Amino acid sequence: MHVSDNDVAFKYRIHAQDKTQVAVVKEEKTGFVLPDGTTTFLCPQSAPMHGFARTSPSYETNYTLDDTMGKNGWNEGYSFPCLFKVQHPQAPRGGKSNAAWVLISETGVDGSYCAGRLLCAATPPTGGQGGSYFIGQPQKGEMNGVGDVSPAIALPGETPWRTITIGETLAPIVETTIPFDVVKPKYAAKSEAKYGRGSWSWIIGMDPSCNFDEQKRYIDFSAAMGYESVLVDALWDTQIGREKIAELARYGKSKGVALYLWYNSNGAWNDAPQGPRHLMDKSQARRAEMAWMQSIGIRGIKVDFF
């Protein structure tokens, strides 16, 4: 467990029992009970293998704002992080707000355990207005059959961290570092990670903007603004091509601007047609792609549809 001024984080550790060295976690009983009058700011999960190119749940649904408790999204719960506005029933009215903010989330998810979601209890244990939520495992059918909703872990083994952040204003919610504070590095980095600023044509021009001339214009824009990078989005493999990407990388380097490249994550788990495809789902192809990017000076990647 970890406790600080505005954060609480906890996880479960399962020890080996007699000769049993593996456990399958069928269900988690962690629950959060919020007081009556609490309102919610939540992102509902969609059913698996629906939506655009069967990519859901893709965590791109709209948040419901200042909504009442007791709902369960579109019957599939909510994606983390989950924000709640809690009323202080005994706080003084007037100058100071009588509300507080609570953020429930998770961190430390890796390949040994599944990510979770937040579900609303059908029958709140405290009565009231349905302010009881609990950790749910993934939906059956997600990822088109890749993986299992009940993780098997070698013992001793641990769950991801469950986190709660509380603040009288939204500042502690926005500024919390709890997702990083409790997670240990998996390996030593070759270089220090540095934050940077960049530009991105797709957010305005979408797929047609992913062409050589427009990306060169965005490199010039980033350089003029003092930004460090440009994100070249989907379809660069067909609308720009590898030789021209290398040329853009050289041009960007001359301007002090590095490139990030978009990749489709998919192997068998969705039908998203945008390329490059089938280069990030298998180790051999991924390593070859990373070597090529390193050789031409690409700074990093954006992986989509996962």
Language-model-detected regions and their locations in the chain:
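Alpha-helix boundary/interfacial micro-motifs
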Residues: 53-54, 184, 243, 273
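Substrate-binding cleft of carbohydrate-active enzyme catalytic domains
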Residues: 195-306
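Generic structural signal for short, flexible, solvent-exposed coil/loop and linker residues
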Residues: 21-23, 73, 150-152, 188, ...
